């Protein structure tokens, strides 16, 4: 299992713990580079101080001083310089912010990026159940009814195909609630921008080559 996949599983476990403990909103902000690497993948969990207290209490029972320490202890050592953890408080509400930066998804990661026929294809299967069906369990649906997922994706080029709720230029948004948030495959297909100035450089090289060829013929 790749380090990034382990980290993604950890992200989801934290999010799931919050969901099962009470109402919550989960936001994902993902930004992709034109070479297919991920510039940043940020997870923001917004919940109440009560739910946070339950999670912190669970962490202390496991021998950790805080929820932060509990989370950071699970991150592979080679990934620690690429991952940050922050908490932002506002009255009775808290935002848990976890971000990974500058990594290339492995083949077994939930986040998959590939180049195909001149396009860049992005998929995130983190929120797609294996059978892709909404649970019929009444208790499960009740627990998830207060859950919201907001996913924001920024691709390096214009998005030409996606299952997002909103698409504008190189950005896409998904806004999901309840059990449907865990039955969704995040998908987008974008153009791959050229290297700035590359076309101009080719034109200059072409003109120089033509000039040399013309000079030789004339000579």
Curated annotation (Swiss-Prot):
It holds the Pfam family PGF-CTERM. GO terms for cellular component: plasma membrane. It is a multi-pass membrane protein. It is found in: Cell membrane. Keywords: Cell membrane, Membrane, Transmembrane, Transmembrane helix. It comes from the Archaea. The chain crosses the membrane at residues 8-28, 194-214. NCBIfam families: PGF_CTERM. This is Uncharacterized protein AF_1487.
């Amino acid at each position: 299992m790749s380090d990034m996949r382990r980290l993604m599983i950890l992200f989801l476990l934290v999010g799931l713990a919050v969901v099962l403990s009470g109402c919550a909103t989960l936001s994902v902000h993902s930004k992709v580079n034109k070479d297919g690497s991920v510039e940043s993948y940020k997870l923001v969990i917004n919940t109440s101080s009560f739910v946070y207290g339950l999670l912190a209490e669970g962490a202390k029972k496991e021998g950790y001083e805080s929820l932060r320490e509990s989370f950071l202890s699970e991150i592979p050592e080679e990934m620690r310089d690429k991952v940050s953890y922050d908490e932002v408080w506002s009255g009775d509400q808290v935002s848990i912010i976890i971000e990974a930066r500058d990594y290339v998804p492995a083949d077994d990661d939930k986040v998959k990026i590939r180049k195909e026929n001149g396009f860049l294809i992005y998929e995130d299967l983190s929120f797609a159940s294996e059978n892709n069906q909404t649970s019929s369990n009444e208790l499960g649906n009740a627990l998830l009814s207060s859950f919201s997922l907001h996913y924001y994706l920024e691709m390096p080029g214009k998005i030409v195909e996606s299952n997002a709720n909103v698409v504008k230029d190189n950005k896409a948004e998904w806004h999901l609630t309840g059990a449907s948030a865990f039955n969704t495959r995040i998908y987008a297909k974008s153009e791959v921008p050229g290297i700035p100035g590359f076309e101009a450089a080719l034109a200059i090289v072409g003109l120089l080559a033509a000039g040399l060829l013309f000079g030789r013929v004339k000579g």
